[in-house]
Amino acid sequence: MVKILNNLIFVLNCGSSSVKFAILNPDNKKKYLSGLVECLFLSKTYMKWKDLTTEHKKCIGSNLSHKDALNFIFNKFFLEKKDIYKNIVGIGHRVVHGGNKIKSSTLIDDNIIQLIQKAISFAPLHNPANLIGIKTAIEKFPIFAKKNVAVFDTSFYQNMPETSFLYAIPYFFYKEHHIRRYGAHGTSHHYVASEVALILNKNFNSLNVITCHLGNGASVSAVCNGICVDTSMGLTPLEGLVMGTRSGDIDPSIIFFMYQKLGMSIDEIHTILTKESGLLGLSGISSDFRYFEKKYYFEKKARLAVDIFCHRLSKYIASYMSLMENNLDAIVFTGGIGENVPLIREITLSKLLLIGFKIDTQRNLGIKNGKHGLITTDKSRPAFVIPTDEELAIAQETIKIIK
């Protein structure tokens, strides 16, 4: 029997249609349990989980809500595995948006819950789900009522300069309504930046790196001397790169045109830009990058969608070079696409030859499915693939806060 160490953290990440969870030791980085409940609100809801030795998958019901999924997780893993439960010392929650008031990870109390509630308009798909996770955890585990910690995606961007976070609209809207760029995926960007600092044997406070979190949602961040100085997502996670179903950057006049000339409602336009655009909108077929990887050389629309994705990504990377004080240590690719699609990394870096990046084809092709490492030639500026581990990052923040 494997000995369970003390100081375990239970991590919850409630997404718009899924619940990720993990139980791990933030000191030795060992995961005793990790899992995902997906396809919430659909005809079949599945749970995949992995303990120290075995992977499992099963259908756990139909049309399940976040609360249903959480109840299933709690009943299965905490009632059955009491040896794990008794060693848990706190619960860490991923929260997408902290609004303008919350600057860093924090213990959760009624005031923090209210502030997360107020920020729902900035993250309407995620913050409500995050709140369900928080409230359910407090209800199920009153013993940890004062040991729930919120770790915010937006915290990493709180030190960005005004030149990066302000929009060129009347200042009144920032002062009175807090309209500014907040960013997202901050926990992931911070984690992989910290990891590449270790690889390069650099103090984090002197690190200059551009991190690319590429998944169904995608963003780029510029870290200069250990501080994030710019990022591609804005007031909401709609701004920036081309994404799975999100448009990313567009001319705002497109919205006026759709409303005034095409007679579309604001809700219809919002749905199009967030759920029907990006790779799905360009191809008319899919938002799944596995499809684009297979069809890139054979279908015109698939190729066009990928090329537009990489075009936008390479432009952001190149523009962030100007923020690096003439010294860029590395680029990092992470996220489901960044870690597992060599094609995207190759196309993107091929556009950055002028600034010193040259792909090593064999290295690049060999790094996916959880592997990490260098993907450029030895004489090139370095680019790395580093798998993100948001659960570990959240656990490390949680143990730091509760201690």
Curated annotation (Swiss-Prot):
- Please spell out the taxonomic lineage of the organism that makes this protein: Bacteria, Pseudomonadati, Pseudomonadota, Gammaproteobacteria, Enterobacterales
Instruction: Give the site residues for Transition state stabilizer.
Output: H185, R246
Where does this one sit in the cell?
Cytoplasm
EC number(s) recorded for this UniProt protein: 2.7.2.1
Q: Where does substrate bind?
A: R94
> What binding details are noted for the cofactor?
Mg(2+). Can also accept Mn(2+).
GO MF, one term, reads:
magnesium ion binding
Q: Where does ATP bind?
A: K20, H213, L214, G215, N216, G217, D288, F289, R290, G336, I337, G338, E339, N340
What is the protein name for this chain? Acetate kinase
